[in-house]
């Protein structure tokens, strides 16, 4: 499996570049929704950058989870935390959903679908921003409105450790080497 290890400073720079792409397009979101976990820090950076440029927005993190229903393997998505947005938005508003990667697109599709169902005539204009897009994995007709990189590699974000070998952590996350040596006996 070909992995792409993304460094924290690289992700932050990409987050600001993503915000600039949104700004340059003329889109002015007055709501920004970061998808927990990976989209939250990117959403914060996008919101901060746009705010500096005079685009103020209300912002919140939401969460999704995948679950299985009878006979289906993990195809169902549950969205948590949309109530605040649903109660606040109006049809003339602009909402930007920020995530770390647009993979299958199923989670983003479910978020948008849930917003449209709940908001009905008050559904705002919705756009999606992600630093990474995996077009071959996309199972929806939607692609992100704003993205920086197309890839099919397995992405390893700065906060991710699960599923990595000690060798991978040492090589690609050298700043953790002292901590890894301390915890290695506890998890080996």
For each feature predicted by the language model, list its residue ranges.
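PRPP-associated nucleotide enzymes
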Residues: 1-188
């Amino acid at each position: 499996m070909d992995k792409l290890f993304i460094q924290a400073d690289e992700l932050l720079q990409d987050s600001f570049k993503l915000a600039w792409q949104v700004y340059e397009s003329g889109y002015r979101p007055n709501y920004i929704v970061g998808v927990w976990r990976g989209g939250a820090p990117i959403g914060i950076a996008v919101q901060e950058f746009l705010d500096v440029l005079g685009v103020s927005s209300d912002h919140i993190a939401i969460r999704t989870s995948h679950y299985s229903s009878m006979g289906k393997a993990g195809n169902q998505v549950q969205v948590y935390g949309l109530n605040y947005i649903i109660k606040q938005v109006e049809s003339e508003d602009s909402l930007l959903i920020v995530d770390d990667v647009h993979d299958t697109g199923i989670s983003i599709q479910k978020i948008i679908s849930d917003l449209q169902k709940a908001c009905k005539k008050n559904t705002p204009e919705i756009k999606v921003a992600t630093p990474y897009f995996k077009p071959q994995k996309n199972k929806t007709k939607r692609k992100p409105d704003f993205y920086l990189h197309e890839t099919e590699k397995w992405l390893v974000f700065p906060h991710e450790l699960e599923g990595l070998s000690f060798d991978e952590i040492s090589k690609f996350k050298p700043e953790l080497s002292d901590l890894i040596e301390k915890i290695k006996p506890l998890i080996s």
